[in-house]
Design a protein with these regions (language model features):
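Gly/Ser/Thr-rich loops at beta-strand to alpha-helix junctions
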Residues: 65-77
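A glycine- and small-aliphatic-rich helix-loop capping segment at beta-alpha/alpha-beta transitions
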Residues: 77-89
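Terminal, contiguous helix-loop blocks that mediate binding/assembly
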Residues: 1-59, 67, 88-219
Length: 219
């Protein structure tokens, strides 16, 4: 009973979402924050559209985030669909979104967290809830479902899967231990930079940028 009370009635102190995903979501979807974030993303996305129109290429969007804290877990669904909405408003369909999601165990080696079972439990609960939601929205095209978010000036509605591809990034290593946070994040950064900058030669002798492989992991 006490565990249930603490889960549904968290005590909020200081700033941030305090590992409470409902607060993290509210921080994004309130009118002022939502429009501010959308405006910033629109500027970047419209620039990308203008550049790719010249080359007849795709716009590839990478979203890297954790889903164990209140902020990441709370925003993980609405932020990608904000991106979908921006492309839809621009009438642009030649784009893909790749999600790289850090699982909760990535943070387990942080000294201040490792010694606190309550925080670990919160991180695991947030991660589980977020991953269940991602799993659902990865298949809405097949189930004919929709994402629908009421906002101040109407609704954000999309029938597209949340990501074109989704990769989960764990903190565990091959020996069963947990890497330090900077090691896990550094390896993903190195991997993505290699993919974004490397060029391969196809069988037909055509130069192909390896960045296309970033989105080949379907689900």
């Amino acid at each position: 009973k006490e565990e249930t009370i603490s889960l549904y009635n968290p005590v909020i102190q200081n700033s941030g979402a305090q590992q409470t995903r409902q607060i993290g979501r509210a921080m994004l979807v309130n009118s002022i924050s939502y429009e501010y974030v959308k405006k910033e993303l629109m500027a970047v996305i419209y620039q990308a559209i203008a550049r790719t129109n010249k080359d007849n290429a795709n716009v590839n969007v990478l979203i890297l985030t954790g889903v164990s804290g209140g902020t990441g877990s709370g925003m993980i669904i609405d932020l990608p669909y904000m991106v979908h909405d921006i492309f839809a408003a621009a009438g642009y369909t030649n784009y893909r979104i790749a999600g790289y999601i850090y699982t909760p165990d990535v943070q387990f080696a942080i000294p201040g967290l490792a010694a606190n079972p309550m925080i670990i439990n919160n991180l695991e609960n947030n991660g589980y809830s977020a991953l269940k939601e991602i799993d659902y929205f990865m298949n809405i095209e097949e189930t004919n479902s929709v994402y629908d978010l009421p906002i101040a000036d109407g609704h954000v509605i999309s029938g597209r899967n949340i990501f074109s591809s989704c990769t989960l990034v764990s903190g565990y290593n091959q020996n069963g231990g947990i890497n330090q946070l900077n090691v896990t994040m550094g390896r993903l950064t190195d991997h993505l930079m290699d993919m974004l900058t490397d060029i391969r030669i196809t069988k037909n002798g055509v130069a192909d940028q390896m960045s296309s492989a970033i989105l080949n992991n379907k689900k």
